Amino acid sequence: MTRTPVNVTVTGAAGQIGYALLFRIASGQLLGADVPVKLRLLEITPALKAAEGTAMELDDCAFPLLQGIEITDDPNVAFDGANVALLVGARPRTKGMERGDLLEANGGIFKPQGKAINDHAADDIKVLVVGNPANTNALIAQAAAPDVPAERFTAMTRLDHNRALTQLAKKTGSTVADIKRLTIWGNHSATQYPDIFHATVAGKNAAETVNDEKWLADEFIPTVAKRGAAIIEARGASSAASAANAAIDHVYTWVNGTAEGDWTSMGIPSDGSYGVPEGIISSFPVTTKDGSYEIVQGLDINEFSRARIDASVKELSEEREAVRGLGLI
């Protein structure tokens, strides 16, 4: 193995998602089974000891691809030479907290991290924001990194995409491997729109196969959009392993490419496609190749879809205005 190790930075590394993520990165699932990695674990000062415990366990796995671990509470150190950054750590919403308060609290995290990425990361840096509100946190980080191409900042909607795949597979009596071209549009929030109108199930149009708009509107979309809350209700804690899995999927697909005839969903800076205002970070259908992505163009958007895309995009535009008003972008 003569390849240069890839520097992967994970923030919130001692948290539940971080714990579910790090061992999979170290085993080669993030970038590939032949790609050595060095891990940088960024945590807040009180959590450094817990991060050290996780690092001890990583050492004890003796992963052949893992060529070093560094633990720090300094973003400038964590992002120095980083090739891939997974921004997992975020301020969760607590009871009685308004959305503006949440955005402001997260601005205090993602603005300094964006600046550190701007000043210290490698030229080929790829950023995935997992910590919620992911789309707008990604926008805050991106705005603080003017020297980094905007398209390198992405937000995770792959968890929603994966959730939608399974719900559609269950409804149609198929497997997730049978489903192609599903799309998540908009925000990673309850307004997101999982779109099956261009999807196929075993080669046949998914919407025609389902042929049940009531199920689509009353069951499928709410189940996918509110799945996170349902998991908290059932588990007593938020999605961790499934979120980590989606982060792995997102980066692996970004780096290694989508399958022929298929696409995926990523939260990316809009170029104005499909009437989504330029600059907001919204989920789109994308194909990826050689570490780059392109929005799938030319899809017909019916009235059912248009109304739902517009509602989610409106929320994203409002979030952008809120963080602009707070001086975060």
Curated annotation (Swiss-Prot):
The keyword tRNA processing does not apply. NAD(+) binds at residues 12-18, 106, 113, 130-132. The active site is at 188 (proton acceptor). It comes from the Bacteria. Keywords: NAD, Oxidoreductase, Tricarboxylic acid cycle. It holds the Pfam family Ldh_1_N. One of its GO terms (biological process) is tricarboxylic acid cycle. Optimum pH is 6.8 at 50 degrees Celsius and 8.5 at 30 degrees Celsius. Belongs to the LDH/MDH superfamily. MDH type 2 family. Homodimer. Catalyzes the reversible oxidation of malate to oxaloacetate. Exhibits remarkably higher catalytic efficiency for oxaloacetate reduction than for malate oxidation in vitro. Shows a high specificity for NAD(H), being almost inactive with NADP(H). This is Malate dehydrogenase. It comes from Streptomyces coelicolor (strain ATCC BAA-471 / A3(2) / M145).
